[in-house]
Amino acid sequence: MDFCFMIFYNSLSGQKEQFKPIEANKIKMYACGVTVYDDCHIGHARTYIAFDVINRYFKYRGYDVTLVRNITDIDDKIIKRANENGESTTELVERNIKAMHDVFARLNILKPSKEPRATETIPEMVAMIETLIKKGYAYQGANSDVFYRVTKFADYGKLSKQNLEALQQGSRVDVVEEKENPMDFVLWKMAKEGEPAWDSPWGAGRPGWHIECSAMSKKLLGDTFDIHAGGSDLRFPHHENEIAQSEACNECTFANYWLHSGMVKVNAEKMSKSLNNFFTIVEVLEEYHPEVVRYFLASTVYRSEINYSKENLENAKASVERLFNALRDIEPIEVNLPDDASEYEEKFIKAMDNDFNTPEALAVLFSLAKEINTLKTTNKYKASGYAYLLRKLCDVLGILFTDIEEYFKQGDGADASEIEKLIAERTQAKKDKNYVRADEIRNQLQQQGIILEDSATGTTWKKG
């Protein structure tokens, strides 16, 4: 495939650019991960599904991708929550990491190439801070905390397109007496009694949030890498501060391209615990199948806001079922690919090569689904070839990962075990020649949208 014509929006330049990796056919990508003080919410799902689609597409296009997604496992929020729960930070972190991995797996998010924890990279953070101090970009305050000297970095604000002087005038940053400037940010924080701490030249403490990502990306991807990704809420100050630290320390460009995913709104309002419209991924998955949630979150262009609402999720559910129904009762066979199948794949590539335009890519999938449905009764050979292509392109987006019949069995709140019990009762009723009861059970299930199919080997069921 042609590597030359992929374009996407670079937050650093503020415009779409042709993608040119540092090393031919290879991509080094860093995505800011979760601070594991609580359960992952729907905003996390949005971000990591967006970048999972991009990761999958890069691989589909033939790139060798190294994706680093970190875990922030030491932070003020983690310490505060552990104290509130009466548990150690280790207990809190390990439980939340397991929960994160569980929900990400349910949403079919691929594991990153590497998943470093902040606490595993302390020596590298200390080394970076020492370099910044030597170069005059950092200083130790009166209370021994170490701060980054923002005014020393001439390009501060280049990612967020903000002027440092204007930021200082409108600053709402809490005034800390030992700071030279209100915009200076902490690189190393001295530990209070009872808090987790690591030795450093400045005393026992822990790293600031921003230096963690700079050190982890440097360790695993080098001084300069291709793509840095994260939620749009991290653009300032987190990503701006990462650039300031890394470029001052390494004296070279930090990341060539910056991708930012759009935020989730709930019924057109900002998602917030105070507005009581905050949903964890687990809560959403209690109501909707992972296929539906993933489709919904992948169906909007990655950098646009997305509105979480029951109506939009129901629309996503209907769309998923349309795609699954097209693949029902047809075996995908690669060798049966029709000659004109390449036209569909080319349209899919054209959409995704243009800033990962998933809505346009999905439109291609629905055109394929329509073609399959038309051919099912007239040319199953050709339909099976199109079905193979539909499966292939769905895999690129990470959708339709569930067995078709298993998906339909889980729909509309139908309890599979209860259905199986009723089928067993119906089978026994037929053996006893109690056909009235057998018909009652069939009708009962039919009202729930469950279709029974009898054969010589027994009875199977599916959601209609």
From Swiss-Prot:
Keyword Protease: no
Catalytic activity: tRNA(Cys) + L-cysteine + ATP = L-cysteinyl-tRNA(Cys) + AMP + diphosphate
EC number from the UniProt entry: 6.1.1.16
Cofactor note as given: Binds 1 zinc ion per subunit.
UniProt xrefs under Pfam families: CysS_C (PF23493), DALR_2 (PF09190), tRNA-synt_1e (PF01406)
Localisation per UniProt entry: Cytoplasm
Motif ('HIGH' region): 34-44
Single GO MF descriptor: zinc ion binding
Zinc recorded as keyword: yes
InterPro entries the UniProt entry points to: Cys-tRNA-ligase (IPR015803), Cys-tRNA-synt_Ia_DALR (IPR015273), Cys-tRNA/MSH_ligase (IPR024909), CysS_C (IPR056411), Rossmann-like_a/b/a_fold (IPR014729), tRNA-synt_1_cat_dom (IPR032678), tRNAsynth_Ia_anticodon-bd (IPR009080)
Protein residues bound to Zn(2+): 32, 213, 238, 242
UniProt keyword list: Aminoacyl-tRNA synthetase, ATP-binding, Cytoplasm, Ligase, Metal-binding, Nucleotide-binding, Protein biosynthesis, Zinc
Residue numbers covered by motif 'KMSKS' region: 270-274
EC top class, as a word: ligase
Residues reported to bind ATP: 273
Cellular component, GO, one term: cytosol
PANTHER family found in the cross-reference section: CYSTEINE--TRNA LIGASE, CYTOPLASMIC, CYSTEINYL-TRNA SYNTHETASE
NCBIfam families in the record: cysS
Family: Belongs to the class-I aminoacyl-tRNA synthetase family.
Quaternary structure and interacting proteins, as annotated: Monomer.
HAMAP family the UniProt entry points to: Cys_tRNA_synth
Protein name per its UniProtKB record: Cysteine--tRNA ligase
Organism: Francisella tularensis subsp. tularensis (strain SCHU S4 / Schu 4)
